[in-house]
Amino acid sequence: MNNYLRKLVEGQHLTEEEMYKAGLLLLNENILESEIAAFLVLLKAKGETAEEIYGLVRALREKALPFSNHIQGAMDNCGTGGDGAQTFNISTTSAFVLAGAGVKVAKHGNRAVSSKTGSADLLEELGVNISSTPNEIDYLLEHVGIAFLFAPAMHPALKRIMKIRKELNVPTIFNLIGPLTNPVNLETQFVGIYKRDMLLPVAQVLQKLGRKQALVVNGSGFLDEASLQGENHVVILKDNEIVETSIEPEKYGFSIVKNEEIRGGNSKENAKITLGVLSGEKSVYRDTVLFNAGLALFANGKAKTIEEGITLAAHSIDSGKALAKLNLLIAASNEELERVN
């Protein structure tokens, strides 16, 4: 580890292979906590490259719980968090809209870190069993079309690092890579990030991970979701090409909605918002979900255009299919699934 620390002190970038090896060392129980802390802080101070992010993601996915990965066409629509906006659970609500539109959703998430309610907190409040094993997750993806992967359970080797992150209380590379460490081999992905300057590096990592299509967004006001407040900065990965662009919500018929208007609350309050959206209630929450789910359906290829994606998202809700997926996941995740373990 000393060699890598010296390079970082000198402001040098690590190669992908060096970062992969450093990542394995970070996960080794024999490494000193002071070395982990120094590495994370020095890397952040230098600034992370796409090669470094990918190297660490490789190490984390290698040490994650093993998956059979026989499920084809899975997608995740996870944000990094860290925007401090305290919005309701946009991507988790959108996940059921995607599932209702026929997309297999492997939703990777955690409890609240910078917000009041994380995806795990919301789903637990709604009655979903968040403790599914890899075999159960495969079963749910195949038979329900949506499954939740509780990040701490999927990545047991990260327990020590999470403790050190909490003690450091400063942003590190781990604030950025959550959506990239999903242990399922995803075909497509929709990622929201709070740091605009990391849009391109994250898209490059998704390309290295073999995503067929992906969309990375930094919302207006530096939201880690697509925002109805104004211009959204976007990077699209398609046909192995990366294109940078921007998207205005007014172009798709949405009214401007300030980010403060879509603030959430505790898990009970956010569950009420999610159920309202999935039940077809008209609101700024619904419009925000339609915009995000529409973009995700475009990123997935289920929709050929963003307009078509928004139309499909609205149909998923208004037909009752999105809510049906939630109810199906609640029932199936709480069943005895010993037959698949």
Curated annotation (Swiss-Prot):
Pathway noted in the entry: Amino-acid biosynthesis; L-tryptophan biosynthesis; L-tryptophan from chorismate: step 2/5
Keyword field contains Transferase: yes
Cofactor descriptive note: Binds 2 magnesium ions per monomer.
Entries under Pfam families matching the protein: Glycos_trans_3N, Glycos_transf_3
Sites where the protein binds Mg(2+) 1: 91, 225
Residues that, per the record, bind anthranilate 2: 165
Catalytic activity: N-(5-phospho-beta-D-ribosyl)anthranilate + diphosphate = 5-phospho-alpha-D-ribose 1-diphosphate + anthranilate
GO CC annotation: cytosol
InterPro entries xrefs: Anthranilate_Pribosyl_Tfrase, Glycosyl_Trfase_fam3, Glycosyl_Trfase_fam3_N_dom, Glycosyl_Trfase_fam3_N_dom_sf, Nuc_phospho_transferase
Binding-site list for Mg(2+) 2: 224-225
Domain of life of the organism encoding this protein: Bacteria
Cofactor: Mg(2+)
GO biological process, one term: L-tryptophan biosynthetic process
Annotated Gene3D superfamilies: Nucleoside phosphorylase/phosphoribosyltransferase catalytic domain, Transferase, Pyrimidine Nucleoside Phosphorylase, Chain C
This enzyme's EC code(s): 2.4.2.18
Binding site for anthranilate 1: 79, 110
Alphabetic keyword roster: Amino-acid biosynthesis, Aromatic amino acid biosynthesis, Glycosyltransferase, Magnesium, Metal-binding, Transferase, Tryptophan biosynthesis
Gene Ontology molecular function terms on file: anthranilate phosphoribosyltransferase activity; magnesium ion binding
Positions contributing to 5-phospho-alpha-D-ribose 1-diphosphate binding: 79, 82-83, 87, 89-92, 107-115, 119
Enzyme class: transferase
Purpose: Catalyzes the transfer of the phosphoribosyl group of 5-phosphorylribose-1-pyrophosphate (PRPP) to anthranilate to yield N-(5'-phosphoribosyl)-anthranilate (PRA).
Subunit (UniProt): Homodimer.
Family affiliation: Belongs to the anthranilate phosphoribosyltransferase family.
Protein name: Anthranilate phosphoribosyltransferase
Organism: Bacillus anthracis
